From Swiss-Prot:
This is Calcium-transporting ATPase. One of its GO terms (biological process) is monoatomic ion transmembrane transport. PANTHER family: CATION TRANSPORTING ATPASE (PTHR43294:SF21), SODIUM/POTASSIUM-TRANSPORTING ATPASE SUBUNIT ALPHA (PTHR43294). Ca(2+) 2 binds at V279, A280, I282, E284, N727, D731. The lineage of its organism: Bacteria, Bacillati, Bacillota, Bacilli, Bacillales. GO terms for cellular component: membrane; plasma membrane. Ca(2+) 1 binds at N699, E702, T730, D731. Keywords: ATP-binding, Calcium, Calcium transport, Cell membrane, Ion transport, Magnesium, Membrane, Metal-binding, Nucleotide-binding, Phosphoprotein, Translocase, Transmembrane, Transmembrane helix, Transport. The active site is at D326.
Length: 890
């Protein structure tokens, strides 16, 4: 039912209730049984045990588990235990990162009011909000949070803050009249109060028409549960890589066994050789190293005031091509601010933003003293006197108690020197006629220390212009002629073109002791002037948008505000290009999902949108192949935040719902912080590419060593445990250190990666194969030289091959830091890498020279002379390629 279109009689009949008696306890019980408690349903929670086991569903992990079974079956228990340990550690890391996952619905539920005043059996009773049922009569006043969806039947100067639900920062004036328009957006339903919104002024009475999941908040909860959770590009690429590697490993195993049996070798030894190759083909440490690299990136992002809630999403930011940003509280400060004051034919600009009383006044671009400009003085003082709000400094922040528009006027007055103490000690409010939606104004009668009295009225400019017979001009009150009215209207249009909300102030001196009625007070006034008010953009957002544009990322503003307001803010932020389009909620309703996908690329601003629209917009960009980041802070943003490839919420002003639905929380609510997060995300992905290149080139080298040996009818140069040691220990430490590499200088000048870019894109596959080939050749040559020198001492030749392979890979790691040459970057820029390489060399020496480990790893001590051979062979692959690149450049 469309309750907002009903009159009071039809409403009471439809809900079967009484304004005098409310509901009986018997009727309440019946309706509770029918509709259920007034609570939001919770989604199914994943148990800790299931969450832990979910960590082992990754394809690469399954491959490693298969390798464990094969190793155990063949009696290679050391290999099996080592692989199991790696898999288990990786699972624990993933479990603890995701433990605090799906809490969105619980946070949404906690927004509900704990208690409300309801009319039951003729008496007003305070009850838990969960006991409300459709048909309950409820009342609410300033400061209350609405407990259910309510059709208002009585409104006294009622204004409700709906920014968390609709995105609008200005409180909505509410009334009890029925609406005649059939199709209105949520923000335009002015005779309803919605669950979770806050009363900022006045009081009201209403009939509950929706509870629990049948509320506007409940619909958001439904969308939140149905919004999908997408895998990240990194997860998809690693899944693809895992499948490639398992196919390679299986083919190699079959090939080795078949060739070996044909050559006359026994089946068991050939199967052992096949498993060795399979182990060599799969980088066992890759899942753990990816997890650690992401974790290290998370730690760096925390220092930059970004908290990552879902680990793989770090990388997603790096390939985001669209940022869909909520305007209110994200691009703007959600703190109404006076920026213009017009009086006596002059317009003053007011600097500063928010509620901090800090900012200068300028006239014709020159800073002025407020004391020298009487019209400005009066505008500021009267704005503070005709005001019921208060601003206090709490924990270093200026906090508003009351209406945001009044907060803006109060702040402007304090900037001009009219402190709270000054106003209260010099003026006394004798009478007040509160604001109501019918009059569209508020009036006070004040008295100063000289017992002079003034009527001061503030309100809608068109209303005050009708009530004013004079206007303050050139230092005195003059006739409010048609010429002056035309000038005032021109100023109004100019301020409106800048998306400023205008408040007019008028006054009239009265006799000492006189206290006129409201009707007498609000006529024959003198128009003093206008204040232009806006929710100002965050100062750092413009630069952040520019840098995102340079990085190939389009920023899209999505807001519940009116088109003109959104357009002005977008232009101020330089977000809207000349060819850019603006689309409102009505236009969105007329387009199907497919039609929106066709036109969405040209749109930069979406205005008057609902939560359903935000979800539709995000999906449209995703259908066009974009990786979408959605930023926001309100309840209304949560479904779209969850649907997006990465959801970004605000840490201070953000609701719990938005935070729990998001993957990334900006601690300082600073839109510009997202730029740093994007930079870090890109760097993390590049670092992951670096260590994938490093690990796979090492594995290619290991595979080729084994294949060369078989083709040349040589014994195995490496045993499985040595290969496993290289993959997990020797390779692992440098790979992790590569994950800590600093970004290259042009990382934010590059276009976003294509979402479907493969792991081996940008010649990575060639680099892996070419480097791996040379590492394999160097290792097998070292093995052949030593083996032919003394065929009886196979363990010594295998140790030489082991040492050559390790050192060749450790030298190669420095080549992986750059897309060009090992000489293009200073190796000492990454001290972690220097430490990792030295540690790996030390561990290699321990395995070779420590007697208790020698039988386990099949190693023996190497003579000093043979170390020259090992070092020389190890250096050949990297420096040979580096030399050829330098020659090619010349």
């Amino acid at each position: 039912m469309k309750f907002h279109e009903m009159g009071q009689t039809d409403l009471l009949e439809a809900t079967n209730t009484s304004m005098k008696q409310g509901l009986t306890e018997k009727e309440v019980k019946k309706r509770l049984d029918k509709h259920g408690p007034n609570e939001l349903q919770e989604g199914k929670k994943t148990s800790a045990l299931l969450l832990f086991f979910a960590q082992f569903k990754d394809f690469m992990v399954l491959v490693l588990l298969a390798a464990t079974l094969i190793s155990g079956f063949l009696g290679e228990y050391v290999d099996a235990v080592a692989i199991i340990a790696i898999v288990f550690v990786n699972g624990i890391l993933g479990f603890f990162q995701e433990r605090r996952a799906e809490q969105s619905l619980q946070a949404l539920k906690e927004l509900s009011t704990p208690h409300v005043m309801a009319l039951r059996e003729g008496s007003w009773t305070k009850i838990p909000s969960k006991e409300l049922v459709p048909g309950d009569i409820v009342k609410f006043t300033s400061g209350d949070r609405i407990g259910a969806d309510v059709r208002i039947v009585e409104a006294r100067s009622l204004e409700i803050e709906e920014s968390a639900l609709t995105g609008e920062s200005i409180p909505v004036v509410k009334h009890a009249d029925k609406l005649k328009k059939p199709d209105v957006s949520l923000g335009d339903i002015t005779n309803m109060a919605f669950m979770g919104t806050i009363v900022t002024r006045g009081s009201g009475v209403g009939v509950v028409v929706g509870t629990g999941m049948n509320t506007a908040m409940g619909k958001i909860a439904d969308m939140l549960e149905s919004a999908g959770t997408l895998s990240t590009p990194l997860q998809r690429r690693l899944e693809q890589l895992g499948k490639i590697l398992i196919v390679v490993a299986l083919l190699l195993t079959v090939l080795v066994v078949a060739v070996g049996v044909i050559q006359g070798h026994d089946l068991y030894s050939m199967f052992l050789a096949g498993v060795s190759l399979a182990v060599a083909a799969i980088p066992e440490g890759l899942p753990a190293i990816v997890t650690v690299a992401l974790s290290l990136g998370v730690q760096r992002m925390i220092k930059q005031k970004s908290i990552v809630r879902k680990l793989p999403a770090v990388e997603t930011l790096g390939c985001a091509s669209i940022i869909c940003s909520d305007k209110t509280g994200t691009m703007t400060q959600n703190k109404m601010t006076v920026t213009h004051v017009w009086s006596g034919g002059k317009t003053w600009r007011v600097a500063g933003a928010g509620y901090e009383p800090k900012g200068s006044f300028t006239l014709n671009e020159k800073e002025i003293s407020v004391n020298e400009h009487k019209p400005l003085q009066q505008m500021l003082l009267f704005g503070a006197l005709c005001n019921n709000s208060n601003i206090e400094k709490r924990d270093g922040e200026y906090v508003l108690d009351g209406d945001p528009t009044e907060g803006a006027l109060l702040t402007a007055a304090r900037k001009g020197g009219f402190s709270k103490e000054f106003v209260e000690s010099n003026y006394r409010v004798i009478e007040e006629f509160p604001f109501d939606s019918a009059r569209k104004m508020m009036t006070v009668i004040v008295e100063n220390q000289d017992r002079k009295r003034y009527i001061i009225t503030k309100g809608a400019p068109d209303v005050l212009m009708q009530r004013s017979s004079r206007i303050y001009y050139d230092g005195s009150a003059a006739l409010f002629s048609n010429e002056r009215k035309a000038e005032t209207e021109a100023v109004l249009r100019h301020l409106a073109s800048q998306a400023l909300r205008t408040i007019a102030v008028a006054y009239r001196p009265i006799k000492a002791g006189e206290t006129p009625s409201m009707e007498q007070a609000e006529k024959d006034l003198t128009m003093l002037g206008l204040s232009g008010i806006i929710d100002p953009p965050r100062p750092e957002v413009r630069q952040a948008i520019k840098e995102c544009r340079e990085a190939g990322i389009k920023t899209v503003m999505i807001t519940g505000d009116h088109v003109e307001t959104a357009k002005a803010i977008a232009k101020d932020l330089r977000l809207l290009p000349k060819s850019g389009k603006i689309m409102d909620g009505k236009m969105l309703n007329e387009l199907s999902q497919e039609e929106l996908s066709h036109v969405v690329e040209d749109v930069y601003v979406f205005a008057r949108v609902s939560p359903e629209h935000k979800l539709k917009i995000v999906k449209a960009y995703q259908e066009n192949g974009h990786i979408v980041a959605m930023t926001g802070d309100g309840v209304n943003d949560a479904p779209a935040i969850k649907q997006a490839d990465i959801g970004v919420s605000m840490g201070i002003t953000g609701t719990d719902v938005a935070k729990e639905a998001s993957s990334l929380v900006l601690v300082d609510d600073n839109f510009a912080t997202i730029k740093s997060a994007i930079k870090e995300g890109r760097n993390i992905y590049e670092n992951i590419r670096k260590f994938i290149r490093y690990l796979l080139a090492s594995n290619v080298g290991e595979i080729l060593v084994m294949l060369f040996a078989m083709l040349l009818a040589l014994p195995l140069p490496l045993v499985p445990i040595q290969i496993l040691w290289v993959n997990l220990v020797t390779d692992g430490l440098p790979a992790m250190a590569l994950g800590m590499d600093q970004p290259e200088g042009d990382v934010m000048k590059r276009k976003p990666r294509h979402p479907k870019e493969g792991v081996f894109a940008r010649k990575l596959g060639w680099k892996v194969v070419s480097r791996g080939f040379l590492i394999g050749v160097a290792t097998i040559l070292a093995f052949i030289i030593v083996y032919h020198r003394n065929p009886e001492n196979l363990a010594y030749a295998q140790t030489i091959a082991f040492a050559t392979l390790v050192l060749a890979q450790l030298i190669h790691v420095f080549d992986c830091r750059s897309e060009t040459s090992v000489f293009s970057r200073n190796p000492f820029q990454n001290l972690y890498l220097i430490g990792a390489v030295l540690s790996s060399i030390l561990l290699m020496l321990v395995v070779i020279y420590y007697p208790p480990l020698q039988p386990i790893f099949h190693t023996v001590a190497i003579t000093p002379g043979d170390w020259m051979l090992v070092i020389g062979m190890s250096a050949i692959p990297t420096f040979l390629l580096a030399g050829s690149l330098l020659t090619r450049k010349k």
